Design a protein with these regions (language model features):
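Juxtadomain coupling helices with adjacent low-complexity linkers
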Residues: 47-49, 53, 60, 71-72, ...
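Nucleotide phosphate-binding site architecture
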Residues: 24, 81, 94
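Amphipathic alpha-helical effector-binding/dimerization core
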Residues: 1-35
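A short, hydrophobic, proline-anchored segment that marks a local hinge/packing element in signaling
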Residues: 76-83
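C-terminal regulatory
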Residues: 29-76
Length: 134
């Protein structure tokens, strides 16, 4: 049986979500000043480790989480940019780890990058940096 927490209307910590990591990596959001909440045994709670992870996200152009937000959940996210190339949002897909192996994750990264390449957001779309949670 597959189950997942209903995140609709809930605050999702940036450091534990794929979209949050994209937003942190590209300075759309700020790492919270306090302690990072541990949601699972895989959640990154050390800020130095998080910065290392965010550097990987910047270099790769996408984020992947496995078991960081909740056990058995995998998520992939890519940045969405405006006409000037400024990251203003993130596009994500998530699902159960049993269905999202590494091959499928790689496929989703390509699909997401392809979809965001079709989006032409005007420069009038900007972001207000947020701390902590989406």
């Amino acid at each position: 049986m597959l189950s997942s927490r209903n995140w609709v209307g809930q605050k999702v910590p940036f450091h534990a979500s794929a979209a949050g990591k994209v937003l942190l990596a590209f300075n759309v959001a700020q790492v919270p000043s306090g302690k990072l909440e541990k949601l699972t045994n895989s959640t990154i709670i050390n800020k130095n480790d998080l910065e290392t992870e965010l550097e990987k996200v910047r270099r790769a152009g996408y984020a992947v989480i496995i078991d960081e937000l909740e056990p058995g959940l995998v998520a992939v996210s890519v940045p969405v940019v405006n006409e000037s190339g400024l990251v203003v949002a993130a596009l994500s897909v998530s699902g159960p780890a049993a269905r999202l192996n590494q091959s499928r994750i790689n496929e989703l990264i390509k699909l997401l990058k392809n979809e965001v390449s079709k989006v032409a957001l005007p420069n009038s779309i900007r972001t207000n940096r947020k701390k902590g949670a989406a």
